[in-house]
């Protein structure tokens, strides 16, 4: 049974320091049994960064109608009337991004951003700076909490989470100068100041596959591809927390690498042999 002290020490051994801005992607199952459960893991993370540090997570929303309204799909009138609007103060988190985020949302002093599908949660001195503003159309790219996280010198921590979990690399996808990016549209029920509900349409880069070749089911997406290439450079930290294999990345460094990677291989004039650039595969070309 893992204790708060042991988890805190393991996180610090990875390279987390007092005052850090830390975006966490966690698998509680991978960490293993913990005294006090997920609340203890949150407490350990906050202990690792100290009172001057901030912990951030990707909360999203467990009732997001993203799939139901994707690219012109439409809910029937009854569903639209009864679908709850997004309220950052009460909305549940999307469990596909890890149960830990729900406990971050419930932590004292937590702030949550207003974009329903890409909602971020943060706890610590930078929480308000990170989470506000967050408007539709700015999910993970420019003007988003992820951009502010990167610019403020954040670190991305994978606690047993796979390499396709590095949310900061979606920012790299958004800002990289490459042609043929995929776009999506979807609708979200927004809560007005007077309690009224308004369905609003968002247009965003497709974070599930920024290019066609990264949107093939069963194949690595851009985030996983870039993260694997970055790990080979050895500029990150690795270790074990509980039973979980963990990675710690400097967000600015991995994002800069990701932008360069995408522009090199998929830019208007990619720096790869023409026959390789023309292939549908998104496998690294050297």
UniProtKB/Swiss-Prot annotation:
Enzyme Commission number: 2.3.1.81
Biological role: Resistance to antibiotics containing the 2-deoxy-streptamine ring including gentamicin, kanamycin, tobramycin, neomycin and apramycin.
InterPro entries xrefs: Amioglycoside_AcTrfase, Antibiotic_NAT-like
Top-rank taxon, per record: Bacteria
Catalytic function, reaction form: a 2-deoxystreptamine antibiotic + acetyl-CoA = an N(3)-acetyl-2-deoxystreptamine antibiotic + CoA + H(+)
Class of the enzyme per the UniProt entry, highest EC level: transferase
Sample GO molecular function, one term: aminoglycoside 3-N-acetyltransferase activity
Similarity comment: Belongs to the antibiotic N-acetyltransferase family.
PANTHER family: AMINOGLYCOSIDE N3-ACETYLTRANSFERASE (PTHR11104), SPBETA PROPHAGE-DERIVED AMINOGLYCOSIDE N(3')-ACETYLTRANSFERASE-LIKE PROTEIN YOKD (PTHR11104:SF0)
DNA-binding is among the record's keywords: no
One of the GO BP terms on file: response to antibiotic
Database matches in Pfam families: Antibiotic_NAT
Keyword field: Acyltransferase, Antibiotic resistance, Transferase
Protein name: Aminoglycoside N(3)-acetyltransferase III
Species in which this protein is naturally found: Acinetobacter baumannii
């Amino acid at each position: 049974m893992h204790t708060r002290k042991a988890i805190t020490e393991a996180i610090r051994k990875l390279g987390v320091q007092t005052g850090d801005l830390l975006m966490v992607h966690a698998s509680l199952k991978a960490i293993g049994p913990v005294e006090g459960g997920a609340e203890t893991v949150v407490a350990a993370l906050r202990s690792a960064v100290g009172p001057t540090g901030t912990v951030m997570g990707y909360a999203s929303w467990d009732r997001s109608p993203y799939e139901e309204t994707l690219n012109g799909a439409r809910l029937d009138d009854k569903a639209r009337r009864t679908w709850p609007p997004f309220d950052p103060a009460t909305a549940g988190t999307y469990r596909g991004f890890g149960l830990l985020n729900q406990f971050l949302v419930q932590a004292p002093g937590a702030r949550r951003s207003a974009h329903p599908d890409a909602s971020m949660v943060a706890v610590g001195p930078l929480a308000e700076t990170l989470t506000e503003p967050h408007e539709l159309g700015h999910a993970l790219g420019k003007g988003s909490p992820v951009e502010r996280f990167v610019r403020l010198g954040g670190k991305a921590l994978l606690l047993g989470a796979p390499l396709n979990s590095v949310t900061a690399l979606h920012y790299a996808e958004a800002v990289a100068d490459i042609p043929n990016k995929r776009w999506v549209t979807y609708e979200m029920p927004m809560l007005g100041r007077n309690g009224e509900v308004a369905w609003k349409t968002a247009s965003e880069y497709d974070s599930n596959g920024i290019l066609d070749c990264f949107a093939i089911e069963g194949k690595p997406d851009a985030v996983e591809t870039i993260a694997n290439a970055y790990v080979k450079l050895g500029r990150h930290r690795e270790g074990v927390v509980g039973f979980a294999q963990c990675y710690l990345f400097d967000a600015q460094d991995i994002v800069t690498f990701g932008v360069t990677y995408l522009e090199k291989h998929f830019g208007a004039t990619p720096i790869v042999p023409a026959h390789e650039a023309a292939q549908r595969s998104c496998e690294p070309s050297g």
